[in-house]
Amino acid sequence: MKFNKVLENIQTYEAGKPIELVVREFGIAPKDVVKLASNENPIGTNPAITKVIRSNADIAHLYPDDSMFELKEALSRKFDVEDENIIIGAGSDQVLEFISRALLNEASSVLMSAVTFAMYEIYAKQMGAKIIRTESYEHKYDEFIEAYHTYKPKIIYICTPNNPTGDATSREEVLKIIEGVDKDTLVVVDGAYMEYAAAKDQKHAIAPTDLLKYENVIYLGTFSKAHGLGGMRVGYGIAQAKLIKELYKMRPPFNITTLSLLVAIEACKDDSFVEASIALHQEQIKRYETFAKENGISYIESYTNFITYLFDENLDSTQISDALLKRGVIIRNLASYGMNGVRITIGTEVQNDVFFRHFAEVIS
Amino acid sequence: MKFNKVLENIQTYEAGKPIELVVREFGIAPKDVVKLASNENPIGTNPAITKVIRSNADIAHLYPDDSMFELKEALSRKFDVEDENIIIGAGSDQVLEFISRALLNEASSVLMSAVTFAMYEIYAKQMGAKIIRTESYEHKYDEFIEAYHTYKPKIIYICTPNNPTGDATSREEVLKIIEGVDKDTLVVVDGAYMEYAAAKDQKHAIAPTDLLKYENVIYLGTFSKAHGLGGMRVGYGIAQAKLIKELYKMRPPFNITTLSLLVAIEACKDDSFVEASIALHQEQIKRYETFAKENGISYIESYTNFITYLFDENLDSTQISDALLKRGVIIRNLASYGMNGVRITIGTEVQNDVFFRHFAEVIS
C-alpha cells in the first residue's frame, strides 16, 4: 500500500516513561517509584474532582454533550470571552493538531524556538510542512522577526512558559512579535503552564483577552498542569470566532470523554486547588535552585512546574537519567532535544527528598 | 488567514442530541428524558467498570501509560493476535482518522455504501478525497467491485453491521470483496456493532483473525457499544504490523484518558456484561419488529443494537423526530442521510414502553 509521502519523515513522540514501565522493567514496587518526568501535578487529584468522578462513575456508557455547552460557558466566564471564541481539545495538544491540519501543507513552513514543545514539529511534519527554528530556546523578538521575513511561516509557535526549558517570554515581547507579523501568519501562544508564570511574575502573564483583538492569534490553555488533570485530556483554544469555526471542521465528535467534560466544568468552579498547587511548587522549587547552586549545576530560571538542569561536560544527561530510572526515579532526559540536560518536575516535599538523595549519589 | 482548501468542503458531524439539550430547550427533567439516539448501551455501565472508575478517581492527574501495554496484551489475548497488530484510538473513530490521514490526499477517492457511518465521508473530505458511494445501502459485492474498477479507490469501507441501517454483510461476502480488490486499496472492516451480529447469526460474524492474512485490510472494533463504554472513547484497529506501524505515525500521544485505559483493560476480562446486554437486546428488539408490523411500518432487519424504521409518504421522519423530542424522547432522524426514516436504539423495557406510547400518539 502506498502511504502519504509525509509519513516517511515522521518520528513518533517519545512520552515520558510511565511508572508501569519502571515496575515492569526493573521490578520496583509502584509505591517506590518517583515520577518527576511528565509535569504532572504532584499534589495529586483535586478532591472535588475525585468526587465528581466517583459520583459519575456509572455513566461511562453515555456519550458526552458534544456541544460542550456547560464547559464553554464556564470557560467563557473564566476568561471573559464568548462561547464562540472557544474550541475544546483532548488536551491543548489536539487543538495544535486542528491548527496544523487546517493551515499547513507541503508548501508551508512553521517557526518555533530552538528548543520547545515537541508536538509542534510532529504535527507540522504530519502535514509535510518545513520546520524552521530560531537560534535560541528563548523566544527573542529579533530572531523571530528575522526568520519570519526570511521564511514567511504559516504558523509561529510561542510556548510561554516554554517546555522543556521552563523560561517565559514577557507579555510585551509576545505582543511585539505578534505586531511584527502580518495577518496571514497564525501566532499560537501556548500557555499550558501559564498559571505558574502568572503567579511568579505579572510581566509574564498573558490572558486570552490580551490576544483576542488579533484575528491571527490563538491562545492555548490546558487543565493538565496546574489543574492536575493530565490524565483526563482536556485543553482549549481561544481565538476570534472565525478562526475557531474553521478549526471546528477538524474536530472529531466526542473528542473528550464524558468524565473529562464533567471534571473540566468542575475545575472551572474554584481556583483554590490551583493556588495550593502553585504555593507548594513555589516553596519546593527553591530547593532545586539551592541544590543546583551548591553542586555547581546550571539551571534555567523556571516559570513552570518543572526545572531544567543543564550539565557541563563532566555530566551526561543520558547516563544520569538511566541511572535514576534504575533507582525508580523518572525524570526527563533532554538529549533528544539536543541538550545535555534534564527536566525535573517539582514534586512534593517527600518526592523531592527522594530525588535529591538519589541524584546526589548518581552525580558524585 | 488562508486555510487549506479542503476546509471549504467540510460539514461537521451532527451528533445525536444530548439529554442536556432537551433539558435546556424543552425544560424536561433529565430523569424524564428517554434517549434512544446514540446507540448507547441501555443497561448502563457495567458495575465492574464503575468500580474501576471509583477506585481510580484520584489519579486524574497522571497521564496514562502511552505504550498501552496492558490493554494491548488484553486485546491480543482476546482476539488471538499480537500486540504489534493493534492500534488504540479514542473510539474506533480515531483509528478511521489515522487511516484517512495516512492514505488519502486530494487525488484519492474512497468507496462506501449509499448509506453508512457518516465519519467515513467527513474524515475523507478532511483530506480532500473524493467520495464514491454504491447504489445500495447494503454492501453488495457486484456494486462494490464495479465501482472499484471504475474509480480505483484508495479505501473501501465495509461497515458491518452497518450504521445507521442495521443490516449486516456476511463474512463470505466481505471476504469476496476483499479478494476482489488489489493490495493498493485498503479495505476497512468496521465491526463497531459486531458483537450483536455475531450473536444473532454466525454467518455474519467476522473476527480479526479472519482478516489478518490480508496486508491491505484492517478490522475496527470498539468498547462503545456492546461493552457500554461510549463515554470513555476507546476503540481499536487490528491489522498486519506494517500497516499498524504507519498508522502509529498519526497517533497523538496520550490519545485516550487514564481512566479510559483502565476501564478498557477491565472490559476485556469478562464477557458476561456483553452477553447480558445482547440478551436484553434480543428480547426487546422483537417488540420493535412487532410494533412495526402491527402499524404497517417497514424496518430493516437489524444486526445491531438499534432498529431502523423506514416511512412511506404518509409519515415524515423530521416531523416525527421533532415531535418526539418535545416529549423528551430522542431518536435519530435519518433525513440527513437522505432517508425518510429513523434510527432507534433498543432501550430497556421501560424506555421502550415510553417510546411506544409516545410514538404511537405521534404517528396517529
UniProtKB/Swiss-Prot annotation, chains A, B:
Pathway entry: Amino-acid biosynthesis; L-histidine biosynthesis; L-histidine from 5-phospho-alpha-D-ribose 1-diphosphate: step 7/9
Keyword terms, alphabetized: Amino-acid biosynthesis, Aminotransferase, Histidine biosynthesis, Pyridoxal phosphate, Transferase
Family to which this protein belongs: Belongs to the class-II pyridoxal-phosphate-dependent aminotransferase family. Histidinol-phosphate aminotransferase subfamily.
UniProt keyword Transferase present: yes
KW Transferase (keyword) present: yes
This protein's name: Histidinol-phosphate aminotransferase
Enzyme class, spelled out: transferase
Annotated positions of the N6-(pyridoxal phosphate)lysine modification: K225
One Pfam family matching this protein: Aminotran_1_2
CC cofactor: pyridoxal 5'-phosphate
GO BP annotations listed: L-histidine biosynthetic process
Catalytic activity from the UniProt record: L-histidinol phosphate + 2-oxoglutarate = 3-(imidazol-4-yl)-2-oxopropyl phosphate + L-glutamate
Self-association and partners: Homodimer.
CDD domains according to UniProt: AAT_like
GO MF, any single term: histidinol-phosphate transaminase activity
HAMAP family, A to Z: HisC_aminotrans_2
Enzyme Commission (EC) number: 2.6.1.9
NCBIfam families: hisC
Lineage: superkingdom: Bacteria
InterPro entries in the record: Aminotransferase_I/II_large, HisP_aminotrans, HistidinolP_aminotransfase, PyrdxlP-dep_Trfase, PyrdxlP-dep_Trfase_major, PyrdxlP-dep_Trfase_small
